[in-house]
Amino acid sequence: MRTPIRRSIVPILAIVALVSACGADTPLGSTEGSKEITFESTDGVTLSGRLFGPDEGSAGVVLAHMFASDQSAWYFFANRLGEQGYRVLTFDFRGFCPGGDAGCSEGEKNIPAIWQDVEGAVEALQSQGTTRLALVGASMGGTASLIAASRLGKDIDAVITLSAPPSFQGLGVGPEVLAEVTAAKLFIAGNEDTDAALAVDAFFGQTLQPKRPVILTTGDHGTDMLTGNQAGIVSTEMINWLERYVPVAKLVSGA
């Protein structure tokens, strides 16, 4: 049985009452129904995030953003997952401070250390009662998610990467790290995003089963793949992977 590491998690705004699971009328890119929080990375940096989905639930997903973006790029997908019963945490990496609904994390930008931000996000969800977890990352967020998964072992049930590079500004995953990722792995990239497509091949060859490579006909990168010409296929692949390896507990009504 897992023993979650408890860290303080500070609510900033009262959660908006949820209607019909997560509010079917809520725009997918909206923060309505979400809760703004702060939490700490595993090396003590205070980060800004948002919780989407139901107040309770054992299945959780951490969404990690790419470099030229922030947590708001995930809001539409976070809402969709929340409506399916997942507890979803988006967050800004250290030093990323877009402001407004997108939040503002403390610290300086330090890309080689951001895997510790992902670890902190995992602890934040665990402190809320989540016991089955997936890490989903775009570009550098995917690289950081693989590193975190290699360290957290069986605490992570699935990892999904969108256009993740093997290395970026001092953040990197080599064969020795990839070999430690026991979670079910889904690697997605576009064939016109050449470096990302090559990375999928490398990741697939250096990791254990279960794993799946998906190369699509597109030049979109990271979270842009969820709004581009292959958006439907990308989201379907991701949701199917989550449903298979991080299923939401279904309530069974009695006779």
Language model: regions and residue ranges:
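N-terminal cap/lid segment of alpha/beta-hydrolase-fold proteins
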Residues: D25-G53
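Alpha/beta-hydrolase active-site loop
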Residues: A73, E106-Q128
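Short beta-strand element of the alpha/beta-hydrolase
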Residues: S58-M66
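Short beta-strand/loop motif that positions the catalytic acidic residue
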Residues: V181, F187-A189
